[in-house]
Regions:
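Enzymes that bind and transform nitrogen-containing heteroaromatic metabolites
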Residues: 1-173
């Protein structure tokens, strides 16, 4: 996320330290929920790195982790998904996440600003892990678009990573 709250995967180049943070996050989870746009962006990148590793450990490890994790994809336009361990879901996002949270297993990750905003009200997100990049974009997809009520949060962790990225963990209070 940019300093002004926008998400744009093309604007950020993750370094080894940032990807290692993502690797740690993915190790604690067994499911990720995607919208169509984020799913297609990830599907077009990471499976190829599994086949042809870059030689950069954190990148290659992340490719394997995201390739192996269970991927739940929400879309009104996709007819099928082909990436390994992916499942297309057409039922209500909130209902599906409530169902997933009731199952045993590890953490559930949410990928994509639209889904994060939708799941923030009602409070279906247990923890926000934000990575703020030192750039002001001025436009793009806002992380918390269409939030109609304030959400009080408590900071549980902060850390400055390489390249000036700040990791912020918050829980709703």
């Amino acid at each position: 996320m940019s300093l002004d709250g926008y998400c744009n995967h093309d604007a950020f180049n993750p370094d080894e330290e940032l990807l290692q943070n993502f690797n740690d996050l993915f190790t604690e989870a067994d499911t990720i929920v995607f919208g169509r746009v984020t799913y297609q962006l990830m599907e077009n990148s990471w499976p190829q790195i599994v086949i042809n590793p870059t030689g950069m450990k954190a990148f290659d490890d992340f490719a394997v982790l995201i390739d192996n994790i269970s991927k739940i994809v929400f879309s009104n336009t996709l007819k099928n998904v082909s990436w390994k361990n992916s499942r297309l879901v057409t039922r209500d996002l909130k209902e599906e996440v409530i169902y997933l949270k009731q199952q045993s297993g590890k953490n559930i990750l949410v990928g994509g600003p639209g889904l994060i905003a939708t799941l923030s009200q009602p409070c279906l997100i247990d923890e926000y892990r934000l990575y703020v990049h030192p750039i002001v974009l001025g436009n793009g997809l806002p992380l918390f678009k269409n939030i109609s009520e304030s959400i009080n949060l408590k900071l549980t962790e902060s850390k400055i990573l390489g390249a000036g990225v700040v990791k912020l963990n918050y829980v709703p209070v």
